[in-house]
């Protein structure tokens, strides 16, 4: 399957730290992942070649459904050229120097996005992505195709029954572990103090709340509902709404976005509430992409390091 994509940087999008899911498995310039297409586990390989995304499924699935899934995950229907014009109008076109072609990387599984977003709180991208990969490997279903094994993300019912454990500060470097060591609880997957949050949120989503309701809700009501979940504060809720459900008004704020926004708007002294209100008013339905481009530019241009050192 060939999908015209225009300006799209597949690798940058995969590695931009969006909390929908870990980056897909890279193999010789292509990326592979297991998708569920009309109930069928289907590993796919995607490769970006000169404005065309080549999609190769490992099994026979309906092509229309597969195409729609890929277009959704990589937000290929979004008019990125229109967004570039918007950046120019807002005097933010400098972010294109390091971020051109970056798109949203949306969840293939909303529940995985919920857990990924909780796991990412106050945590490095490397650590939370490894944690999610461990959770998949331990409690997801294994699917092997052509000698390559992929794991689904476990259901809320499965994670509800997983032990929290007591290995909060486990060293994550596997070469420092005994050869017969095996992970058997959540904390040993590196989620630390978030383990009880993950279990309780899994229980709520298994027994009390249908996460699919979010799709049909407006942003404010959906955010209020998500804040009832264990381990979900304002930033995590906005990550779930953005990457899990593409609520474009969402503007996730963490310590780095806070510093970036105060850096580019000197004298405003934003707090989190005023920053979100400003972003929604100033950027409207482009707020999601503005946040994505601002953070990616700061990370790739060195601004993030300067802000960390207090020299920005």
UniProtKB/Swiss-Prot annotation:
Q: Its domain of life?
A: Archaea
Q: Which GO terms describe its biological process?
A: base-excision repair; nucleotide-excision repair
> Known InterPro entries for this protein?
DNA_glycosylase (IPR011257), HhH-GPD_domain (IPR003265), HhH_base_excis_C (IPR023170), Ogg1 (IPR004577), OGG_N (IPR012904), Oxidative_DNA_repair_enzyme (IPR052054)
Q: Where is the active site?
A: 235
Report the catalytic activity.
Answer: 2'-deoxyribonucleotide-(2'-deoxyribose 5'-phosphate)-2'-deoxyribonucleotide-DNA = a 3'-end 2'-deoxyribonucleotide-(2,3-dehydro-2,3-deoxyribose 5'-phosphate)-DNA + a 5'-end 5'-phospho-2'-deoxyribonucleoside-DNA + H(+)
Which residues lie within the region annotated Disordered?
A: 1-22
Q: Does the keyword DNA repair apply?
A: yes
Pfam families assigned to the protein according to its UniProt record, in alphabetical order: HhH-GPD (PF00730), OGG_N (PF07934)
Q: Where is the composition biased (Polar residues)?
A: 13-22
Q: Which UniProt keywords apply?
A: DNA damage, DNA repair, Glycosidase, Hydrolase, Lyase, Multifunctional enzyme
Q: What is its EC number?
A: 3.2.2.-, 4.2.99.18
What terms describe the molecular function in GO for this protein?
8-oxo-7,8-dihydroguanine DNA N-glycosylase activity; class I DNA-(apurinic or apyrimidinic site) endonuclease activity; damaged DNA binding
Q: Where is the signal peptide?
A: none
Q: What does this protein do?
A: DNA repair enzyme that incises DNA at 8-oxoG residues. Excises 7,8-dihydro-8-oxoguanine and 2,6-diamino-4-hydroxy-5-N-methylformamidopyrimidine (FAPY) from damaged DNA. Has a beta-lyase activity that nicks DNA 3' to the lesion.
Assigned protein family: Belongs to the type-1 OGG1 family.
Task: Report the protein name in the record.
Answer: Probable N-glycosylase/DNA lyase
What species is given as this protein's source?
Methanothermobacter thermautotrophicus (strain ATCC 29096 / DSM 1053 / JCM 10044 / NBRC 100330 / Delta H)
């Amino acid at each position: 399957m060939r999908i015209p994509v225009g300006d799209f940087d597949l690798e940058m999008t995969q590695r931009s730290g969006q909390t929908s899911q870990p980056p897909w498995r890279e193999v010789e310039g292509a990326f592979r992942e297991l998708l569920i297409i009309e109930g069928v586990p289907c590993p796919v390989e995607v490769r970006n070649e000169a404005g065309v995304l080549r999609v190769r499924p490992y099994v026979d699935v309906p092509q229309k459904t597969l195409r729609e899934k890929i277009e959704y995950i990589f937000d290929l229907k979004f008019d990125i050229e229109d967004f570039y014009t918007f950046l120019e109008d807002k005097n933010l076109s400098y972010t294109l120097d390091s971020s051109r072609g970056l798109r949203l990387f949306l969840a293939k599984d909303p529940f995985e996005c919920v857990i990924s977003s909780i796991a990412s709180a106050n945590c490095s991208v490397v650590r939370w992505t490894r944690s999610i990969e461990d959770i998949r490997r331990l409690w997801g279903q294994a699917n092997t195709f052509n000698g390559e094994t992929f794991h689904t993300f476990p259901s809320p019912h499965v994670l509800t029954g997983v032990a929290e454990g007591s290995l909060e500060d486990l060293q994550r470097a596997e070469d420092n572990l005994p050869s017969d060591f095996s992970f058997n609880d959540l904390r040993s997957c590196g989620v630390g103090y978030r383990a009880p949050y993950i279990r309780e949120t899994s229980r709520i989503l298994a027994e009390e709340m249908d996460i699919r309701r979010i799709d049909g809700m407006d942003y404010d009501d959906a955010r209020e509902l998500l804040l009832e979940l264990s381990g979900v504060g304002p930033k995590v809720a906005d990550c779930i709404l953005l990457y899990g459900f593409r609520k474009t008004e969402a503007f996730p704020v963490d310590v780095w976005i806070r510093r970036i926004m105060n850096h580019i708007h000197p004298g405003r002294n934003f707090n989190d509430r005023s920053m979100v209100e400003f972003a929604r008013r100033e950027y409207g339905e482009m707020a999601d992409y503005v946040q994505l481009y601002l953070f990616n530019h700061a990370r790739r241009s060195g601004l993030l390091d300067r802000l960390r050192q207090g020299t920005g």
